[in-house]
């Protein structure tokens, strides 16, 4: 069944009129300045915490943050300053935490003799600890605080 041409035109006009207000509404923005092309001052960089104390993680599977300064560390295809302290054979000498065993696995889960190439560039996951305030409220609670056995111990 085909629609009469006049009805088709009327339906098209009604749809267009109804969609008009939807197109004129402002789209919600996630971030940025009120005027996207205007220049705004960059916020100050947060201060790096360099007290060498490890801190708890903020969410499950979070890579540990770096509790010391890394400015000037060489991290390239030819050199990785992080490995001078955190490689298995050196970590005991300098009291640095050893690299996780997961960093020695390739994509297929096979163990390698040295750090996997996909885990070689530490700062792809690990970042220096700073005094930056969270952008959103963190409601993460460690599993140990949620289990009945740990609640009885309190």
Swiss-Prot record:
Any one GO BP annotation for this protein: anaerobic respiration
Protein's cellular compartments: Periplasm
Induction remark: Induced at high levels by nitrate under anoxic conditions in the dark. Induced by oxic conditions, even in the absence of nitrate. It is suggested that the extent of electron flux to nitrate or oxygen, under anoxic or oxic conditions, respectively, serves as the signal for induction.
Knockout or disruption consequences: Decrease in nitrate reductase activity in deletion mutants and failure to grow in dark under anaerobic conditions.
UniProt keyword terms in alphabetical order: Electron transport, Heme, Iron, Metal-binding, Periplasm, Signal, Transport
GO terms for cellular component: periplasmic space
Region (Disordered): 27-47
InterPro entries: Multihaem_cyt_sf (IPR036280), NapB (IPR005591)
PANTHER family noted in UniProt: PERIPLASMIC NITRATE REDUCTASE, ELECTRON TRANSFER SUBUNIT
Protein name (Swiss-Prot/TrEMBL): Periplasmic nitrate reductase, electron transfer subunit
Biological source species: Cereibacter sphaeroides
Gene: napB
């Amino acid at each position: 069944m085909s629609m009469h041409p006049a009805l088709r035109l009327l339906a098209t006009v009604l749809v267009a009129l109804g969609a008009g207000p939807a197109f004129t509404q402002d789209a919600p923005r996630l971030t940025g300045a009120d005027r996207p092309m205007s220049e705004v001052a960059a916020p100050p960089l947060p201060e790096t915490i360099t007290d060498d104390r490890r801190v708890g993680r903020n969410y499950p599977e979070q890579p540990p943050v770096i509790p010391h300064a890394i400015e000037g560390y060489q991290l390239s295809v030819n050199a990785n300053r992080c490995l001078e302290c955190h490689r298995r054979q050196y970590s005991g000498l300098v009291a640095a935490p050893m690299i996780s065993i997961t960093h020695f696995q390739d994509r297929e889960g096979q163990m390698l003799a040295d750090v996997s190439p996909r885990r070689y560039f530490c700062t792809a996951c690990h970042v220096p600890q700073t005094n930056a305030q969270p952008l959103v409220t963190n409601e993460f609670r460690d599993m140990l605080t949620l289990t009945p056995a740990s609640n009885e111990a309190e």
